[in-house]
Design a protein with these regions (language model features):
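Phosphate-end processing signature that detects enzymes handling 5′-triphosphorylated RNA
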Residues: 1-205
């Protein structure tokens, strides 16, 4: 939620696991001076999913130092866990790519929320942003949501943050709009870093 509050230097750390392939990575996402996302990945043992060992913490510090020129002095803690099923489609020519995520599950401690089984997140990537999949989605009146982040949506859906109005369009489409305001205990999670089981999709239809 740092970008929701206008903070220029932002860092998110997540542990990502691919269940079928039995692969695991520690990912560090940062914002450079141009506002572009920089993502660095470290191979990680599957049995260490959900934890950060010394090598993982050193990776975080190294990435932070290389971009910002300062040591990473923050304490990391697990805040939210996310799981979902993904289908990836890749065109044989042209480099067009589509991912379809479904059965999303968000969890913080004892609390959890899921999306309906017939609701999906579709992300498209093409050279000019006007690929075949984009044209089909537009014809079906399915237009991109301006702001979307699984982490932010999950935190809002579980009422772990005070402000989430910028993500209301995504929350409504996924039908996980929080029903009440968060308590101070829930709000204590703000500013921490997420651990999840897969990619965060930057574009949402």
């Amino acid at each position: 939620y740092d970008h929701h509050q206008g903070r220029r230097r932002r860092c998110k750390v997540r542990v990502r696991k691919y269940t079928d392939a039995q692969l695991c990575f520690v990912e560090v996402k940062l914002k450079d001076k141009r506002g572009l996302t920089v993502k660095k990945r470290l191979d990680y043992a599957v049995d260490k999913y959900g934890t950060l060992d010394d090598a993982a913490c050193a990776h975080v510090d190294r990435c932070y130092r290389n971009l910002y020129g300062k040591p990473f002095r923050h304490t990391l803690q697990a805040v939210i866990e996310m799981r979902y099923q993904r289908v990836t489609l890749v065109a044989r020519e042209g480099g067009e790519r589509m991912t379809i995520d479904g059965n999303l599950w968000f969890s913080i401690g004892e609390r959890a929320r899921t999306t309906r089984p017939d609701v999906f997140i579709v992300e498209t990537k093409s050279a000019n942003g006007n690929g075949i999949a984009d044209k089909i989605l537009r014809a079906l009146h399915q237009h991109p949501t301006a702001r979307y982040s699984k982490y932010c949506v999950g935190m809002a859906a579980l009422e772990a943050v005070e402000r989430h109005n910028k993500f209301l369009p995504a929350l409504r489409k996924l039908e996980v709009v929080p029903e009440r305001r968060p308590t101070p205990v829930m709000m204590a999670a703000r500013g921490a870093h997420a651990m999840d089981s897969a990619l965060t999709a930057p574009s949402f239809h």
